[in-house]
Amino acid sequence: TLFPYTTLFRSVINKPRTDYKGRIFCYVLDDEHYVIGGPVNNGGVILRWLRDEILASEVETAKRLGVDPYDVLTQIASRVKPGAEGLIFHPYLAGERAPLWNADARGSFFGLTLSHKKEHMIRAALEGVLYNLYTVYLALIEVMNETPNTIKATGGFAKSEIWRQMMADIFDTNLIVPESYESSCLGACVLGLKAIGEIDDFSIIEKMVGTTNAHQPNEDTVAIYQELVKIFINISRSITESYSEIA
């Protein structure tokens, strides 16, 4: 899983598989492997939107103090319990690719009440990004007909221990993140080595990745998220036709 401004969720398999519902894709990696998965538009870009539009004053203070604005963002989110007290965010601020494939999709908060504050909106937004990615994961499981026991993630989001644990809980799966957060370049180098015959297989990656951070799902939090994910999916389905009307 990669978390740049957009986000990718993929798995490597030995035989090609097709999603007849058109939610995810499958393509050749090499002579013996295929990649299956899907990209979403709304990953790290949601954090940037929160930073620039919701937390502008806090960000200015953070800059003066020499603090990473994204650390401030996730710390504010950590003040709120998992589930953001019933607030759900659909993160479709830039339309959406997998699994909706709908350029007209729009973002929304659902469940907003007078008791919700800025920190609830931030937590709900972070959770919403992962809820959406989880729907890609569900499609992947359906097509592969198996459930991975571990997810390996990389990208800017991986710097946040709070968001990493959030992902482990929402996906109810062990999460491993390399300390070298930006691993796309490393992966490209390894593919190049394999292509020119310098290595026989991809097992060398384990040594090259180095130290990793591991997170296990919290059983109580998993139960909360499983209920909210159902609501997230149901809402998205119920308003799909309205996206084109408001776009």
Language-model-detected regions and their locations in the chain:
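Short, small-residue-biased leader/transition segments that mark boundaries at the very start
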Residues: T1-L8
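Active-site core segments that coordinate phosphate-bearing ligands/cofactors
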Residues: F9-A247
